[in-house]
Curated annotation (Swiss-Prot):
Quaternary structure and interacting proteins, as annotated: Monomer.
GO MF term list: peptidyl-tRNA hydrolase activity; tRNA binding
Transmembrane helix found in the keyword field: no
Catalytic activity: an N-acyl-L-alpha-aminoacyl-tRNA + H2O = an N-acyl-L-amino acid + a tRNA + H(+)
InterPro entries assigned: Pept_tRNA_hydro, Pept_tRNA_hydro_CS, Pept_tRNA_hydro_sf
Stored SUPFAM superfamilies: Peptidyl-tRNA hydrolase-like
Site (Stabilizes the basic form of H active site to accept a proton) residue list: D95
Name under which the protein is recorded: Peptidyl-tRNA hydrolase
Gene symbol of the encoding locus: pth
Species annotation: Pseudomonas savastanoi pv. phaseolicola (strain 1448A / Race 6)
């Protein structure tokens, strides 16, 4: 299994969206940066906040696009192209309507499932969809017409605590992910629920 060289956290920029459900992926990357004592700095050529740390001799880059969600691929393609990071070495963390709060799941490849950030990443990577995903459950409002307001809204405290717990679970399996032990990482992560 290819080593992960880039971890992307999806979200929308600006104070208006900072604490919204749609920014779950960005929360995950912020937590990694804090744990690794990495300062995320704006990089105009990568359209986002970036940082880097070394894990067992391997550079791992962090990216939070500062484009809007539906343009996330611009940032991912720019950074991955510049550093020649293969699509299979990218992990994208994002909010997932189809999972309840408190649940996180890993996935390799697949479609965008209606997620505009994933849709743009796949398009900007030349229709390659073999990157890894960390799906952070935010739940579903129950009515498709309410999805936009739901993902762009703040979660109630109990829901946010469950999302935070699922991020903790995901951080706990990062050593397995870095070691390429995807089956073990999936088994451990998928058995936990806040």
């Amino acid at each position: 299994m290819t080593a992960i060289q880039l971890i992307v956290g999806l979200g929308n920029p600006g104070a208006e969206y900072e604490q919204t459900r749609h920014n779950a992926g960005a929360f995950f990357v912020e937590r990694i940066a804090a744990a690794q004592r990495v300062n995320l700095v704006p990089e105009r050529k990568f359209f986002g906040l970036t940082g880097r740390f070394t894990h067992q001799g391997q550079d791992v880059r962090l990216l939070i696009p500062t484009t809007y969600m539906n343009r996330s691929g611009q940032a991912v393609a720019a950074l991955a192209g510049f550093y020649r990071i293969p699509v299979e070495s990218i992990l994208v963390a994002h909010d997932e309507l189809d999972l309840p709060p408190g649940v996180a799941k890993l996935k390799v490849g697949g479609g965008h499932g209606g997620h505009n950030g994933l849709r743009d990443i796949i398009a900007q990577l030349g229709n390659q969809n073999t990157f890894h995903r960390l799906r952070l459950g935010i739940g579903h409002p129950g009515d498709a017409s309410k999805v936009s307001g739901f993902v762009l809204g703040r979660a109630p405290r109990a829901e946010q605590e469950k999302l935070d717990a699922s991020i903790d679970f995901a951080l706990g399996v990062l050593p397995d992910i870095f070691a390429g032990e995807w089956n073990r990482a999936m088994k451990n992560l998928h058995s936990q629920k806040a």
